[in-house]
Regions:
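Radical SAM enzyme [4Fe-4S]-AdoMet core and its adjacent flexible, acidic
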Residues: 1-133
């Protein structure tokens, strides 16, 4: 069995849970990051400010590294790679405008679906960042 995990912006809250599930099931964890071709792709974790993103990644790596087996190496590799990749703030000259537009689109989709991303963002740091966009 293999687990396929795509890390999204809200999904950074589930990294540890996916790691634990992989270990419980003794399943290989295939990991990737949500693709983004512009700064409006608010579901990409690369929309987060670098300091916040690195803080979350470092917390997860501190938990994962001592416990990992080769089945979870993909997760470690992707997390380490995310720390070296440019965030939207570094890559796009008008990142703030794109991120605001992405937030507006996400909220419109929430209204259609009857969902609320603010209820999904249980990490207080992510919720605070979201509210301040």
């Amino acid at each position: 069995m293999q687990l396929d995990f795509t890390i999204t912006m809200p999904g950074v809250q589930e990294i540890r849970n996916m790691f634990d599930l992989s270990q419980q099931l003794n399943a290989k964890l295939l990991t990737k990051v949500t693709f983004a071709f512009d700064s409006q792709q608010i579901m990409s974790p690369m929309c987060l400010p670098k300091t916040l993103l690195n803080e979350i990644i470092d917390e997860n790596l501190a938990y994962i590294r001592p416990r990992a087996t080769p089945l979870q190496q993909s997760l470690i590799d992707v997390l380490e790679n995310m720390k070296t990749r440019t965030t939207f703030w570094e890559e796009y000259p008008n990142a703030e405008i794109g991120i605001r537009s992405g937030k507006t689109r996400c909220e419109r989709i929430d209204a259609i679906r009857g969902t609320d991303i603010k209820k999904i963002l249980t990490d207080k740091r992510l919720l605070e960042w979201w509210k301040n966009i």
